[in-house]
């Protein structure tokens, strides 16, 4: 006989947080949003943590390299979409990883015997004004000088001059050994009023550059999420078909964390994928899995070896899985159930597996509700699709700007692998739509605003960290009438009155 859940399936919109006691310490400036991204054992630190509880969805219309960089600057992680060729996805990951400043391997190098024309051509090709001059013209050759735009004046030169005649020679450069830390390098740059600092090894070979502009950028983005080499943390999506070829390419490209992109994670296909990763990489490659909506699904993926588990089926704004197939669960109910299973699993095994709430976030206050219900972080699609940094076109419709946004199960994305249950036969119907979302400006401005609301609400609950919020939060179901009561009501708002007068 079929199993029936006793409780009605609820969404975030049906809940409110009841305020708790707030001490004088409970101010937004004191709130920390740091949260684990991957599993860890009791008493240990997670291998990767987020500085903000946000990751971007594995979607063509959301997670490109530009958004990956922008989100990492704010402290989150973008999962580059996997519904593209292996080579294209790996290249996108590599470009995002290599964007970051810090210790940068030089990609603009030239020999002393090259000419000014060669310098100009190299600058036009790479877009960089700082060019390393090495004996053999390689990125790790013996450094003999540097050429910048200050070293030559095109209008007064023929173009045939050798680089050695106008470069700044090594003896006039300030350099640092390869044992120098990033902080020490930045101090040297500051003290000597430099724009760049070459880092050389004991043999005088060039290892890296450290640039002033990257120090300035870090000051503007104190929460930026970096790996051990001071590069941005970047994620990537994989599927349950070509993982044996895709994963090695993504690891080689520098992906810090992977995630199986599937609408339904309670399947043998996901456990096979996770088993392959553990067999070939052990715990060195971090892989999230999902999506599931109940305790049983969570435990299945936990035992299969998932590093984090995504919750949600059919709750995304462009997802029509519930409509076409009749499967899913209200996001709030699913999240509460799975997080309870997560906590019990932690008590029993001593292993904490982070839970990601994927879908159903419509308003900013839904973010706080999801975190209070137990989510460690949120995967957002529509939210990020609205921004300048998403990879879609911005278009004007009747004077209003929109961004294109389509689901991975739509005909446009043709990412049937996400919705396949395996086997050779491909699905032939859509589970996502092609749509528009209102254009909202830059990622930084919007994320700052959204998280300021999250922090403010956490203070209302007397919490300064996400775990503290989950411990102290008091949630109540609301009726349809109280939902209406919660907004502006029984007044004529001024903008409406202005429209009526026209």
Give the label of every model feature segment.
Residues 84-94, 140, 155-160, 205-225, ...:
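Active-site-adjacent beta->alpha loops and helix N-cap segments on the catalytic face
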Residues 1-21, 108-111, 176-177, 183-187, ...:
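Alpha/beta catalytic cores of nucleotide-metabolism and tRNA/nucleoside-modifying enzymes
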Residues 73-88, 255-267, 307-325, 361-395:
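Glycine-rich phosphate-binding active-site loops on the catalytic face of alpha/beta enzymes
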Residues 79-84, 108-110, 130-132, 175-176, ...:
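Catalytic beta/alpha-barrel core
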Residues 47-56, 102-107, 227-236, 278-293, ...:
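Short beta-strand/loop segments at the ligand-binding rim of alpha/beta enzyme cores
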Residues 45-47, 72, 97, 120-124, ...:
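Surface-exposed amphipathic alpha-helices with a cationic face
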Residues 66-69, 243-253, 287, 293-311, ...:
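Catalytic cores of alpha/beta
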Residues 27-50, 57-59, 88-128, 133-136, ...:
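Bateman/CBS regulatory modules and CBS-like beta-alpha motifs in cytosolic regions of diverse proteins
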